[in-house]
């Protein structure tokens, strides 16, 4: 198998993947799993592939690892960004792949991954121009320029993890709205019977330009010592949150 794969060009394999995905989508057997009955969920996920003790090429990423004796060593590695389409809870397949490259000395690893994501989204839009998509990812992608790319350039929706370190003014604005009882609250959600909150168009309070609807989920659980822990999640989305879709949005975002 490896022998034949080595003989094929990446473009050839990419075209084969595209035909397989389009065939599955046209079959309509996964339509019921679309978000809000419309959007295909596409998850961005970075994965490390190859590690080297010496620099392999100009595009190598670099990290430091502390050894057992306390010494630090440099490791060079290649990382790939995958866009995976969720067809069902059991079926998640690759939609596109892009290498994360070290473009310049002064560019951070986060910027390298964001730039790779932008290249990857462009490829996906070209391959599937009319596919209704909701892009999902961690807090790295919760940047206004990336949201604008998804919503305004490609006309897609998005759900990203929200962290204070990524969108501090947004987080503060949401907390201010929540303290003023401006958020909607629903209890008994999901398997844990937790509590959900949401507020739409928080960007109007935060002074942002991109659509930022915030929703969160909280539930209680016990650790191995039977001590109660509170687990919290918070997300940001371009999709309008309602009482009817909050649980589906939480299950999707998790």
What are these regions (language model features)?
Residues 1, 38-49, 83, 117, ...:
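Short, conserved catalytic/metal-binding motifs centered on acidic residues
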Residues 2-89, 101:
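Active-site-proximal, Lys/Arg-enriched surface segment
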Residues 50, 92, 167:
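Flexible, glycine-rich phosphate/dinucleotide-binding loops
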Residues 56-59, 148-152, 173-175:
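Short, glycine/charged-enriched secondary-structure capping and boundary segments
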Residues 64-132:
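Electropositive, glycine- and tryptophan-enriched low-complexity nucleic-acid-binding patches
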Residues 85-87, 99-101, 139, 160-164, ...:
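Short, structured patches in soluble enzyme cores that scaffold and shape functional sites
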Residues 107-169:
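Domain-level cores of phosphate- or acyl-group-handling catalytic modules
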Residues 159-253:
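An anionic, glycine-rich sequence signature occurring as long contiguous blocks
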């Amino acid at each position: 198998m490896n022998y034949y794969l080595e003989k094929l060009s990446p473009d050839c394999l990419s075209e084969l993947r595209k035909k397989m995905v389009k065939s599955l989508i046209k079959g309509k057997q996964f339509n019921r799993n679309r978000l809000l009955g419309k959007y295909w969920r596409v998850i961005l996920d970075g994965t490390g592939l190859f590690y080297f003790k010496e620099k392999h090429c100009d595009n190598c990423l670099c990290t430091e690892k502390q050894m057992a004796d306390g010494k630090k060593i440099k490791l060079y590695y290649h990382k790939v960004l995958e866009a995976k389409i969720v067809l069902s809870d059991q079926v998640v397949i690759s939609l596109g792949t892009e290498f994360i490259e070290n473009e310049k000395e002064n560019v951070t690893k986060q910027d390298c991954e964001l730039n790779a994501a932008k290249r990857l989204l462009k490829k996906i839009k070209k391959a599937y121009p009319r596919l209704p998509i909701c892009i999902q990812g961690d807090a790295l992608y919760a940047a206004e320029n990336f949201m604008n790319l998804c919503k305004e350039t490609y006309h897609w929706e998005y759900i990203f993890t929200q962290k204070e370190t990524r969108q501090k003014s947004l987080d503060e604005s949401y907390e201010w709205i929540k303290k003023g009882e401006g958020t909607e609250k629903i209890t008994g959600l999901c398997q844990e019977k937790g509590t959900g909150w949401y507020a739409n168009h928080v960007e109007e309070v935060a002074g942002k330009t991109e659509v930022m609807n915030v929703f969160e989920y909280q539930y209680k659980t016990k650790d191995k010592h039977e001590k109660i822990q509170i687990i919290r999640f918070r997300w940001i989305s371009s999709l309008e949150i309602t009482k009817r879709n909050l649980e589906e949005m939480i299950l999707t975002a998790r």
